[in-house]
């Protein structure tokens, strides 16, 4: 008796060639609905599944493969006499090869399918057949990915059957595939049918391998890059690389951080970043001037940095950027001349990202791994209204200082805590990131500012991501000549800090919102 294969696919890629090959090898093919129509058109002999079950497809195809004559043929163990006896008693012939892929749930969702359309794209029979076949992989070969047709065909042609090793690998792949498929459905339905004030008791996330990496944060660490099952358009995961080597683990982390900073600015802006901290941010009326500001902010740290521009890279801007070593440049687009200039640098990575979708990226939850678990939170993307800020001091900030405070407050949100930043209204001047005490971060930011041209320091302000716990911070700020501060407020010693500002003639604004970043 010839061996039997069951083929039921939504993705018809490569199926005709595969079916022809196994038919030539003597396999009998059972098929369903649309798959049968394709095979019939190519004149490949096949049997309709209802001829096997004796039961017609019904309910618009919702019920067609959920039948004992199918699942018994998949699940029956060939090494157990009791199973083989049951199969004989019920006239069940074994099925040794299952080729199934699932209804395009993800594709329909990304295309904006209605709720009714999404429900119809929840595959029931397909996952059931895949799981049954995968469970019985000791005897059954199961294929859920057209990319695996060739390796199955190769073994069948050579040996008449597949190896246990291949069947085991394909079975594991099936359970990854169906788990991912169900995770997307669970995610969709959880969002569609929320329970008020209730957290889902299970968190189901699915990611697809985007890139295997040479190593992780350090050479002794292995790493891979996975993309969310529902892609975020404005993201490093969805970027398009035009030139250069593959991204490293650290490249991806830094590029992601830089994209998050750039997302907050609508005017022409350039962000320069190193080790997850901004080292230069500049805004201007045009992108070339914005580059000048970002570069001048810290011409030392920018070396080997990650650059994000929120406008097309022009020839003039490219000429300037090409004069220093940069790891990555990300922009919406590049002029022809700019691309030619930058592509001459062998080691630079040039990428594009769709900036028109940046607001949509704000909806994605942030997931952080810890030993034994995950932390999940919304992004820190609350829209703030500076008109609601409170002037806490006797001295009122000038209009120019208020504009600088708005800029500083956007920028300091992305500095690692304890985070301090000194800016004017269009440019960062000094960054003090990641110290375990706030006065340490203040000193670093002020030291970086001290070597700037006096003209750049005019109307400079200082921003702090969280409140000042002690007035000693104000003493340091006053020594540097800073005359305006923006911070959340909220310390039990706020009054001491306010009095220190009044003593030094410093204007200070409370925003009421903290922006820790760890």
From Swiss-Prot:
Ranges for domain MGS-like: 1-144
GO molecular function: IMP cyclohydrolase activity; phosphoribosylaminoimidazolecarboxamide formyltransferase activity
UniProt-listed GO biological process terms: 'de novo' IMP biosynthetic process
The protein's name: Bifunctional purine biosynthesis protein PurH
Reaction equations catalysed: (6R)-10-formyltetrahydrofolate + 5-amino-1-(5-phospho-beta-D-ribosyl)imidazole-4-carboxamide = 5-formamido-1-(5-phospho-D-ribosyl)imidazole-4-carboxamide + (6S)-5,6,7,8-tetrahydrofolate; IMP + H2O = 5-formamido-1-(5-phospho-D-ribosyl)imidazole-4-carboxamide
Domain notes: The IMP cyclohydrolase activity resides in the N-terminal region.
Family as reported in the entry's similarity comment: Belongs to the PurH family.
A GO cellular component entry from the record: cytosol
Species, as recorded: Lactococcus lactis subsp. cremoris (strain MG1363)
EC number of the protein: 2.1.2.3, 3.5.4.10
TM ranges: none
Gene3D superfamilies: 3.40.140.20, Methylglyoxal synthase-like domain
Assigned keywords, A-Z: Hydrolase, Multifunctional enzyme, Purine biosynthesis, Transferase
Metabolic or biological pathway, per its Swiss-Prot or TrEMBL entry: Purine metabolism; IMP biosynthesis via de novo pathway; 5-formamido-1-(5-phospho-D-ribosyl)imidazole-4-carboxamide from 5-amino-1-(5-phospho-D-ribosyl)imidazole-4-carboxamide (10-formyl THF route): step 1/1; Purine metabolism; IMP biosynthesis via de novo pathway; IMP from 5-formamido-1-(5-phospho-D-ribosyl)imidazole-4-carboxamide: step 1/1
Pfam families cross-referenced by the UniProt entry: AICARFT_IMPCHas (PF01808), MGS (PF02142)
PANTHER family: BIFUNCTIONAL PURINE BIOSYNTHESIS PROTEIN ATIC (PTHR11692:SF0), BIFUNCTIONAL PURINE BIOSYNTHESIS PROTEIN PURH (PTHR11692)
């Amino acid at each position: 008796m010839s061996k039997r294969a069951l083929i039921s696919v939504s993705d018809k890629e490569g199926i005709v060639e595969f079916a022809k090959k196994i038919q030539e090898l003597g396999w009998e093919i059972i098929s369903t609905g649309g798959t049968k129509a394709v095979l019939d058109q190519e004149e490949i002999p096949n049997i309709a599944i209802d001829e096997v079950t004796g039961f017609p497809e019904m309910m618009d195809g919702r019920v067609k493969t959920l039948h004992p004559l199918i699942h018994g043929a998949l699940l029956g163990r060939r090494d157990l006499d009791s199973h083989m006896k049951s199969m004989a008693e019920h006239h069940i012939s074994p099925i040794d090869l299952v080729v199934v892929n699932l209804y395009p749930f993800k594709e329909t969702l990304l295309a904006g399918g209605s709720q009714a359309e999404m429900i119809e794209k929840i595959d029931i029979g397909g996952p059931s057949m895949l799981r049954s076949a995968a469970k019985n992989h000791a005897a059954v070969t199961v294929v859920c990915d057209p990319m695996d047709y060739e390796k199955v065909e190769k073994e069948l042609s050579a040996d008449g059957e597949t190896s246990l090793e291949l069947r085991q690998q394909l079975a594991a792949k099936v359970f990854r595939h169906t788990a991912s498929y169900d995770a997307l459905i669970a995610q969709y339905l959880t969002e569609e049918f929320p329970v008020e004030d209730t957290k889902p008791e299970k968190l189901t996330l699915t990611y697809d391998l985007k890139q295997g990496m040479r190593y992780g944060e350090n050479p002794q660490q292995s790493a891979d890059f996975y993309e969310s099952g529902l892609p975020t358009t404005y993201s490093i995961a969805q970027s398009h690389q035009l030139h250069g080597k593959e991204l490293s683990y650290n490249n991806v982390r830094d590029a992601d951080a830089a994209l998050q900073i750039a997302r907050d600015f609508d005017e022409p802006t350039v962000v320069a970043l190193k080790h997850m901290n901004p080292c230069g941010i500049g805004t201007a009326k045009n992108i070339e001037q914005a580059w000048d500001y970002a570069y001048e902010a810290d011409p030392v740290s920018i070396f080997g940095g990650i650059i994000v521009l929120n406008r097309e890279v022009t020839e003039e801007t490219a000429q300037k950027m090409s004069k220093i070593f940069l790891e990555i440049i990300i922009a919406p687009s590049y002029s022809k001349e700019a691309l030619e200039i930058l592509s001459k640098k062998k080691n630079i990575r040039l990428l594009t990202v769709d900036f028109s979708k940046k607001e949509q990226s704000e909806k994605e939850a942030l997931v952080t791994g810890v030993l034994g678990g995950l932390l999940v939170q919304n992004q820190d993307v609350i829209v703030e209204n500076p008109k609601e800020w409170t002037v806490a001091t006797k001295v009122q900030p000038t209009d120019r200082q208020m504009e600088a405070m708005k800029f500083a407050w956007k920028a300091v949100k992305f500095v690692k805590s304890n985070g301090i930043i000194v800016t004017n209204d269009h440019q960062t001047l000094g960054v003090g990131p990641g110290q375990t005490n706030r006065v340490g971060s203040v000193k670093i930011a002020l030291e970086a500012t001290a070597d700037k041209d006096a003209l750049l320091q005019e109307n400079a302000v200082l921003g702090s991501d969280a409140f000042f716990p002690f007035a000693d911070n104000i003493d340091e700020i006053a020594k540097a000549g800073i005359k305006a501060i923006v911070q959340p407020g909220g310390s039990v010693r706020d009054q001491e800090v306010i009095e220190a500002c009044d003593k030094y003639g410093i204007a200070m604004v409370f925003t009421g919102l903290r922006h820790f970043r760890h």
